[in-house]
Amino acid sequence: LIRMHIVAHSDSKLDQDIKLKVRDHLVNWLSPQLAACSSAQECRLILEQKLDAIRDETCREIEACRGNYGASVMLGEFDFPVRTYGEITLPEGKYQALKVVLGDGKGSNWWCVLYPPLCVGKTAEADKDVRWFISSLFSELKKKAEAHE
């Protein structure tokens, strides 16, 4: 599982609008590049190779929206609260994520799941695949936890 987390520069209307424009741009830009990923490791490798390009794309979008700040882009393990995506709820915890911080990063944030893709256009079949993937993932985690008890 790999999440994407975008933190706005501030909570001003302009900065929140920029965050949403950056979100739309990155989701549209990354989707075709991650479409063929068959594992979280493969997705992570592609993201690692594209960190500079992701930052450049983010900064271009900020500038196009008349923002006067930069961005930092990191790939790592970050804390997330409980989050529901449609019928799927992810528990609180540490997750691999692409974190994009706009400017000072003091504004409200937005997140989604890049792999499996929960922040791209979805179909009923894709939703079923994602539910199966997450259900399988949590079953494996539960088995490992029970084995260590």
Regions found by a protein language model. Give the residues of each.
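Early exported N-terminus immediately downstream of N-terminal targeting peptides
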Residues: 1-47
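Solvent-exposed coil/turn segments that connect beta secondary-structure elements
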Residues: 7-11, 76-78, 103-105, 115-118
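Structured segments of extracytoplasmic/periplasmic soluble domains
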Residues: 9, 25-37, 53-65, 118-121, ...
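Intrinsically disordered, low-complexity acidic/polar segments
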Residues: 13-15, 82, 109, 121
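Mid-length scaffold segments of soluble, non-membrane domains
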Residues: 41-101, 105-107
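Soluble extracytoplasmic domains of inner/organellar membrane proteins
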Residues: 88-141
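Extended, compositionally biased alpha-helical segments that mediate assembly or anchoring
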Residues: 135, 146-149
